[in-house]
From Swiss-Prot:
Residues 342-383 form the PAC domain. It holds the Pfam family HLH. Homodimer. Heterodimer; efficient DNA binding requires dimerization with another bHLH protein. Interacts with ARNT; the heterodimer ARNT:AHR binds to core DNA sequence 5'-TGCGTG-3' within the dioxin response element (DRE) of target gene promoters and activates their transcription. Binds MYBBP1A. Interacts with coactivators including SRC-1, RIP140 and NOCA7, and with the corepressor SMRT. Interacts with NEDD8 and IVNS1ABP. Interacts with BMAL1. Interacts with HSP90AB1. Interacts with TIPARP; leading to mono-ADP-ribosylation of AHR and subsequent inhibition of AHR. Keywords: Activator, ADP-ribosylation, Biological rhythms, Cell cycle, Cytoplasm, DNA-binding, Nucleus, Receptor, Repeat, Repressor, Transcription, Transcription regulation. The gene is Ahr. GO terms for molecular function: E-box binding; nuclear receptor activity; protein heterodimerization activity; protein homodimerization activity; sequence-specific double-stranded DNA binding. Residues 37-65 are annotated as: DNA-binding. PANTHER family: ARYL HYDROCARBON RECEPTOR (PTHR10649:SF9). Residues 1-38, 421-449 are annotated as: Disordered. The PAS 1 domain is essential for dimerization and also required for AHR:ARNT heterodimerization. This is Aryl hydrocarbon receptor. Mono-ADP-ribosylated, leading to inhibit transcription activator activity of AHR. Residues 49-81, 116-124, 260-262 are annotated as: Required for maintaining the overall integrity of the AHR:ARNT heterodimer and its transcriptional activity. Residues 111-175, 266-336 form the PAS domain.
Length: 848
């Protein structure tokens, strides 16, 4: 601290000067010099007194004579205060056993106090009424950068910003009203307290208005922007006992008030700062960055002793080669401006370990000239260091790791060492890379140059065990991709699954071909490779690695171990269950073709047209002549579930070719939209639960009322129904069509057949195997196809009785419909087989 007129803020204390070398004793004897003997005795006593101070040895070695005296007085005053404040009982002082127990308890309290200081987000400060720092905890260094020995028994105003000194003086007064005559002299430091109060004039110590909470800015050596740190002071005024001060008349003064407070930063620290605040260390360097000192924390983090650190020469020997030019740039900036700014680089610790540090260097002046450099460094994690390395600016036309060729106009012979990556393998730095003829000698460079520091570094500090080879990693990545793709295989058909499997096998063969170059390609220079030696000791060959990379090997091994392969998981039932719970529609699919999606737009158009035609039908009711026809249809189809939706066919019916064509005189009936695909809404009917297969759009062409009943198709067999009774045929007829398979339903279900009379524009629906849905009754609807009922037709009665009895149509029928108005030219037989078979040769169009 300085009290000069031009210096108003605190600075670092001057240190003990370096002792001169002891001159040899002359042969003629020692001359008597009383003044020198007096100085020697004084220095001896000061050294003995300094050794008694409660400070680390590295701090004591740097104290000058005045600092030793100042700290000794401060320690004695603090001891006197605690002797009074923590006065023990006479029994404890007289009893030896109790005294031993008290010493153990005091030692435990001391250890607990150190832990409390480390956990506290701030430091403890005690300031007397005359603005002297009575005590400051050692943690003040973590926040302000000052040593504890630098601020004790010094004026507190030298630490406070000039604009906040008046407020701090007001807070020191018990009534917040200090004497105006005792102003703060900004040039010459703090005032001397001339007014002392007696206990009668002061309020009780436990009064509420003795509490203090205020803010002010303190001088901070760690701040890079303003040099001050805003802190919050929270505490109270308490009596400072045991000081034994005397007045001008020699009378003993009563204890005076002092501020006991905890100073905490206004901005709370981050988690990273909390973790690393106890590891900040400082080093001292010459102007050429040669280290000349290190504190105790630095020795603990780096592992060097102060002697090992100071006898190595240039400080650039401890810096990573890829960071040398980056640090040199900050070094030049510090020489020009006095401060380097925050610099992140890798520092070499003991046992060839690299530590990322964030440092800030300051230039210290003495007598107006630069004297030495103080560097404050904070350790970083490897992740933080890599982030700073990526953000590092590369404004120069070369990287910091390979810039020597530009600076020295020579080709760099140190390409393996100058790799900017911190991790290198031994295989990449063989002896053949270090040509003896290209390696310059140490004497060819200046001792203080970067190249000289680089040559003095050991090559082993840049070496580490090799990592796993890249081909194995790429194969594992491909294996994970194939496993993810196996989920899609469960939805594909058998043919596409085989093709995908063949493609995956092809990929595995490509990987094996890529790795078939031999061990030399996988592991270059494998004789010097640690991984190769370990594999040889374990009895593992490169052929074993190739077999492990084979996909079939992994699959066989996992199957033998009882593991479940993703491709063996069948989720079809789960998907069907989800669709059954979510939708009320059915899905009819054809087993011979692939599924074709139906868009939602088609569903909307069909629903709108259905609503329009329903309104037209309500406006035009059917005539009375159709009532028997409707009754017959209702009797034939007792449940709507057994309507045309249940009589779909795997294939097509044969074309009916009646002669002459008959036209039914009936009005156009309501157009029914049979939305048989699951994505179409509008039907509430469900069907018997059948296995799902692929489906195909099935188109049914309907004829108008004034046209023949069915169009002609040359590829189909004509089936004509005579107008007589339905009688079983004794002899099956031959046909080009093998069979016409109807939808198979359980035996307890009945079949409803509706003869279609009035047919309208063609409609598209899906024919095939039924969806696996449970049959539920739906809303009653008027059938599309209605046949006029006539009591004169005995065959109709027999057919109706069979339908109502819910029998199974497994036999062959021949029908005679001459009463309807046409004669049969060819008798057709309708076979209802037990199983449905696909008809690939028949066109997807037919009539029922």
């Amino acid at each position: 601290m300085s009290s000069g007129a031009n210096i108003t803020y605190a600075s670092r204390k001057r240190r003990k000067p370096v002792q001169k070398t002891v001159k040899p004793i002359p042969a003629e004897g020692i001359k008597s010099n009383p003044s020198k003997r007096h100085r020697d005795r004084l220095n001896t006593e000061l050294d003995r007194l300094a050794s008694l101070l409660p400070f680390p040895q590295d701090v004591i070695n740097k104290l000058d004579k005045l600092s030793v005296l100042r700290l000794s007085v401060s320690y004695l005053r603090a001891k006197s205060f605690f002797d009074v404040a923590l006065k023990s009982t006479p029994a404890d002082r007289n009893g030896g056993q109790d005294q031993c127990r008290a010493q153990i308890r005091d030692w435990q309290d001391l250890q607990e106090g150190e832990f409390l200081l480390q956990a506290l987000n701030g430091f403890v400060l005690v300031v007397t009424a005359d603005a002297l720092v009575f005590y400051a905890s050692s943690t003040i260094q973590d926040y302000l950068g000052f040593q504890q020995s630098d601020v004790i028994h010094q004026s507190v105003y030298e630490l406070i910003h000039t604009e906040d000194r008046a407020e701090f003086q007001r807070q020191l007064h018990w009534a917040l009203n200090p004497d105006s005559a005792q102003g703060v002299d900004e040039a010459h430091g703090p005032p001397q307290a001339a007014v002392y109060y007696t206990p009668d004039q002061l309020p009780p110590e436990n009064a509420s208005f003795m509490e203090r909470c205020f803010r002010c800015r303190l001088r901070c050596l760690l701040d890079n922007s303003s040099g001050f740190l805003a802190m919050n002071f929270q505490g109270r005024l308490k009596y400072l006992h045991g000081q034994n001060k005397k007045g001008k008349d020699g009378a003993l003064l009563p204890p005076q008030l002092a501020l006991f407070a905890i100073a905490t930063p206004l901005q709370p620290p981050s988690i990273l700062e909390i973790r690393t605040k106890n590891f900040i260390f400082r080093t001292k360097h010459k102007l050429d960055f040669t280290p000349i000192g290190c504190d105790a924390k630095g020795q603990l983090i780096l592992g060097y002793t102060e002697v090992e650190l100071c006898t190595r020469g240039s400080g650039y020997q401890f810096i990573h080669a890829a960071d040398m030019l980056h640090c040199a740039e900050s070094h030049i900036r510090m020489i020009k401006t006095g401060e380097s700014g925050m610099t992140v680089f890798r520092l070499l610790a003991k046992h060839s370990r690299w530590r990322w540090v964030q440092s800030n260097a300051r230039l210290i002046y003495r007598n107006g000239r630069p004297d030495y450099i103080i560097v404050t460094q904070r350790p970083l994690t490897d992740e933080e260091g890599r982030e700073h390395l990526q953000k590092r600016s590369t404004s120069l036309p070369f990287m910091f790791a390979t810039g020597e060729a530009v600076l020295y106009e020579i080709s760099s012979p140190f390409s393996p060492i100058m790799d900017p990556l911190p991790i290198r393998t031994k295989s990449n730095t063989s002896r053949k890379d270090w040509a003896p003829q290209s390696t310059p000698s140490k004497d060819s460079f200046h001792p203080s140059s970067l190249m000289s520091a680089l040559i003095q570094q050991d090559e082993s500090i840049y070496l580490c065990p090799p990592s796993s080879p890249a081909p194995l990693d790429s194969h594992f990545l491909m294996g994970s991709v194939s496993k993810c793709g196996s989920w899609q295989d469960s939805f594909a058909a058998a043919g596409s699954e085989a093709a995908l499997k063949h493609e995956q096998i092809g990929h595995a063969q490509d990987v094996n071909l890529a790795l078939s170059g031999g061990p030399s390609e996988l592991f270059p220079d494998n004789k010097n490779n640690d991984l190769y030696n370990i594999m040889r000791n374990l009895g593992i060959d490169f052929e074993d690695i190739r077999s492990m990379q084979n996909e079939e090997f992994f699959r066989t091994d996992s199957t033998a171990a009882g593991e479940v392969d993703f491709k063996d998981i069948d989720i079809t039932d789960e998907i069907l269950t989800y669709m059954q719970d979510s939708l009320n529609n059915s899905t009819l699919m054809n087993s011979a073709c692939q599924q074709q999606p139906v868009t939602q737009h088609l569903s909307c158009m069909l629903q709108e047209r259905l609503q329009l035609e329903q309104q037209q039908q309500l406006q035009q009711p059917p005539p009375q002549a159709l009532e028997p026809q409707q009754q017959l249809c209702q009797m034939v189809c007792p449940q709507q579930d057994l309507g045309p939706k249940h009589t779909q066919i795997n294939g097509t019916f044969a074309s009916w070719n009646p002669t002459p064509p008959v036209s039914f005189n009936c009005p156009q009936q309501e157009l029914k939209h049979y939305q048989l695909f699951s994505s179409l809404q509008g039907t509430a009917q469900e069907f018997p639960y059948k296995p799902e297969v692929d489906s195909v759009p099935y188109t049914q062409n309907f004829a108008p009322c004034n046209q023949p009943l069915l169009p002609e198709h040359s590829k189909s067999v004509q089936l004509d129904f005579p107008g007589r009774d339905f009688e079983p045929s004794l002899h099956p007829t031959t046909s080009n069509l093998d069979f016409v398979s109807c939808l198979q339903v359980p035996e307890n279900q009945s079949h409803g057949i509706n003869s279609q009379s009035a047919m309208v524009s063609p409609q598209a629906y899906y024919a095939g195997a039924m969806s696996m849905y449970q049959c539920q009754p739906g809303p009653q609807r008027t059938p599309v196809d209605q046949t006029q009922y006539s009591s004169e037709i005995p065959g109709s009665q027999a057919f109706l009785s069979k339908v109502q009895s819910r029998g199974i149509f497994n036999e062959t029928y021949s029908s005679d419909l001459s009463s309807i108005g046409h004669a049969a030219q060819t008798t057709g037989h309708l076979h209802h087989l037990a199983e449905a078979r696909p008809l690939p040769d028949i066109t997807p169009g037919g009539f029922l």
